[in-house]
Amino acid sequence: QPKPTTSLDFLKQFNVSKTAKIIDIGGGDSYLVDNLLEMGYQNITVLDISEAALDKAKQRLGMKASKVKWIVADAADFKPTEKYDFWHDRAAFHFLTRDSEVESYIDTVQQSMCPHGILIIGTFSTNGPKKCSGIDIRQYSEESMVAQLKKYFHKVKCFTIDHITPSGATQNYIFCSFRKM
């Protein structure tokens, strides 16, 4: 999506400061980073398991790429060295299918977020696909997402949307926003 409206709407909803530390987990070559830079955000980190995807985004951004911190890592194993105000995860969390991976990831998120930070997670819903790019995923409902995160985060809002893929397929996502307690 050239303009990831759902994700950008969260930034507006929470009135995220242009100097806030933002991390995009699984950002790869998505256009969120382009939009963040265009909107004047100054502390952006993009993490993805695929160096090739990050390289594609860097090439697309040209000189602007130097304004972004790029991290090649598996979200399940990532151990940040700084704290974030806004943690964005669109379609990385659902690849964590083992309970131990999910628990480790949630621990990392809560340890790496500033007090009252905002967490956005978008995954395939229980009405969405069971696989992504041929890989098994874990589907979520509002209830199951909240149950995973309620120890450290207060739910602000959840909703489902249909995403149309480039091939024309419809994928149902659930997006939830949380505030760190």
PLM features: what roles do these ranges have?
Residues 111-114:
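Short, conserved loop/helix-junction motifs that constitute active-site signature segments
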Residues 88:
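A conserved beta-strand element that flanks and buttresses the S-adenosyl-L-methionine
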Residues 1-82, 96-108, 118-181:
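Class I (Rossmann-like) S-adenosyl-L-methionine-dependent methyltransferase catalytic domain
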Residues 91-95:
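Short catalytic micro-motifs in class I SAM-dependent methyltransferases
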Residues 85:
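Conserved acidic residues
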